Amino acid sequence: MSEVNRESLEAILPQLKCHFTWNLFREGSMSSHMEDRVCNQVEHLNSEEKATMYDLLAYIKHLDGESKAALECLGQAEDLRKSEHNDQSEIRRLVTWGNYAWIYYHMGRLSEAQAYVDKVRQVCQKFANPYSMECPELECEEGWTRLKCGRNERAKMCFEKALEEKPKDPECSSGMAIAMFRLEEKPEKQFSVDALKQAMELNPQNQYLKVLLALKLLRMGEEAEGERLIKDALGKAPNQTDVLQKAAQFYKKKGNLDRAIELLGKALRSTVNNSPLYSLVMCRYREILEQLQNKGDADSSERRQRMAELRRLTMEFMQKTLQRRRSPLNSYSDLIDFPEVERCYQMVISKESPDVEEEDLYERYCNLQEYHRKSEDLAALECLLQFPRNERSIEKEEVKEQT
């Protein structure tokens, strides 16, 4: 391809509506478990939703430098779009074609990139801009993608725009309700439960909406109705990870931590490398342990045994969380909040543990403190690592107090 055509292609690519022009991730902000989460969700979606996820997965693969795998994901997305056989299919394929064009461009395969640009132009040429178009289908596609990437405010704007033209569209209503649910933690945002109820009426088989409504009802004091919805959703989608996780959140808020752990454990069976889920289990065990510590009967042998087991489980799931990080320092920034991790470390290191486990745990904690630039805490822990084992037990309590 000539240099002139390259320049023309470079002028056209930013006009395409696709993942490469939506600014989905700030630099370095994509979490290391994003790919695992997307892959797990694909299993429980219909063909249209799967295509959306494969488009996103292709973009993630591209960011990871896996161009061949990215193209394979786009092929799956396109096959799914072709099988839809409805009037939206070709319009939604514009996103996939845009992604194809960008990936081929980055691979230096400019003629193939141009071929997909031409496909986009053939669909859009009747509009003012030959390489993009305004329509609810594309707004909805962008909205779902932003929602999956945690860009909830922008996702809500996309769904609002789509619903202006299609106010009763089930897919857009669902996306809008989920975006509003996630944004309600902000004090300036007002959320009506009616949005979730309307979305459920339009999508009666969507169990994720059902558990979100249950959580909202729990906050409103309607615990019994919320739990009824939770049980119904779990009965109809017993292995859907996002449903299990929200159900676990429901029982956590209700105070039933054992049930929350049970549901998180079930979710982990189908997504074994999901470190955030391991961290949630870790936190639930830590909460049960704190509850026991605050109770009486300190000399009860049964209670001491239970507390020892909870410390072991807290440590076990902490290690599992850290082991599933991708970076050399196990991506501490991608864990749950630093204070939460730190509390678990402090709880475990105050007790005796096997030599190898203790050494590894302290080294990980030093890395954690170093990552967060807590130099004084780091120095104290590094000093502790230099002590012979029989001297460490004397110093442990002091180090715990410092951290």
From Swiss-Prot:
Membrane-spanning ranges: none
InterPro entries assigned: TPR-like_helical_dom_sf, TPR_rpt
Main location: cytoplasm
One GO term describing the cellular component: mitochondrion
Gene3D superfamilies xrefs: Tetratricopeptide repeat domain
TPR repeat residue numbers: 94-127, 136-169, 172-206, 241-274
Location within or outside the cell: Cytoplasm; Mitochondrion
Subunit details: Component of an interferon-dependent multiprotein complex, at least composed of IFIT1, IFIT2 and IFIT3. Interacts with IFIT1 and IFIT2. Interacts (via N-terminus) with MAVS, TBK1, TRAF6 and RIGI. Interacts with COPS5.
Family designation: Belongs to the IFIT family.
The name this protein goes by in its record: Interferon-induced protein with tetratricopeptide repeats 3
Organism: Mus musculus (Mouse)
